[in-house]
Amino acid sequence: MTNQPTEIAIVGGGMVGGALALGLAQHGFSVTVIEHAEPAPFVADSQPDVRISAISAASVSLLKGLGVWDAVQAMRCHPYRRLETWEWETAHVMFDAAELKLPLLGYMVENTVLQQALWQALEAHPKVTLRVPGSLIALHRHDDLQELELKGGEVIRAKLVIGADGANSQVRQMAGIGVHAWQYAQSCMLISVQCENDPGDSTWQQFTPDGPRAFLPLFDNWASLVWYDSPVRIRQLQNMNMAQLQAEIAKHFPSRLGYVTPLAAGAFPLTRRHALQYVQPELALVGDAAHTIHPLAGQGVNLGYRDVDALIDVLVNARSYGEAWASYPVLKRYQMRRMADNFIMQSGMDLFYAGFSNNLPPLRFVRNLGLMAAERAGVLKRQALKYALGL
């Protein structure tokens, strides 16, 4: 097939691209989603995906508005109500949903569960066309339209193309959009474990000079551990069998973790990227295609959902006023709404990373003093929590 017309072509149908496609379709846009492969089917008695996202209250509201949250809950997710962080035992900061008069802070959700819930909704929507397997090989702009050439010869002509294709975005590269980027001197290991005790509804993170150690409670007696460390150390951990990894967990995680049995693990390097622009005429970037962040506070996908909410709002409003909704002036409104917010969150995580990634005694004293002050900050602490939750 050639020259297939659509209003909006979205490259990438994952957690962010899928949500954006569904939201735009629900507002009457015709949407074509180009994705390499369908998400894996959900298997109820399977062990959890090692890739876990902490979905904030604001992101849950977005997913409820899209009509997919019930499907997520019908598969599996786990609420969390408290978030605790510390380095010294005398310097804890506790964020509690009750401080904001909320029932919970958010949910721990496997990435595959979110992807499957969104995919099912996309398959059922009459305004959505799925091109899967689909692989973008070229992108050209002709006469105020974007022309997407796919592997196999199909050409899609769209009024707007959106790159939701991840950190190594082809759309961003083909559009010639540069990035400001650097590699952190840390990698991250995600470990799926079974707990001897109920994991509860609190997530916690202990800072160490080598990197944080974090605990994310999941369904039943499952949990996810997050181990940040030097790339060399993470490679050592990757080469261990599960019994050896279990011994390392017991040595290097706080005693409150209790006895856990690791059953799966995966690792990835940590890179900060920020696109120099989010938009061009008839083109926009969302999610990791536009920005990646240190996963310290679990904000990656939540920032992507803020992008989704803002871009839908901009496009729907522009169309309602009869504007050329795919034009550069309109798309710049989206960039203005999101670029600064994403930069602030990235910079905040960079400060935490820099402040907690060394073992100088004076700095250790200052940062723990800062944690103690944060715990007693009252209104400022609540405002920081509201900002992180997108409220």
Spans of model-derived segments:
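Conserved N-terminal helical subregion
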Residues: N3-Q4, R76-M174, W182-S187
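FAD/FMN-dependent oxidoreductases across multiple families
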Residues: R235-Y321, W325-A326
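C-terminal helical "tail/cap" subdomain of flavin- and related membrane-associated enzymes
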Residues: D313-L391
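N-terminal FAD cofactor-binding segment of flavoenzymes
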Residues: Q47-E84
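N-terminal Rossmann-like FAD-binding beta1-loop-alpha1 element of flavoenzymes
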Residues: E7-V33
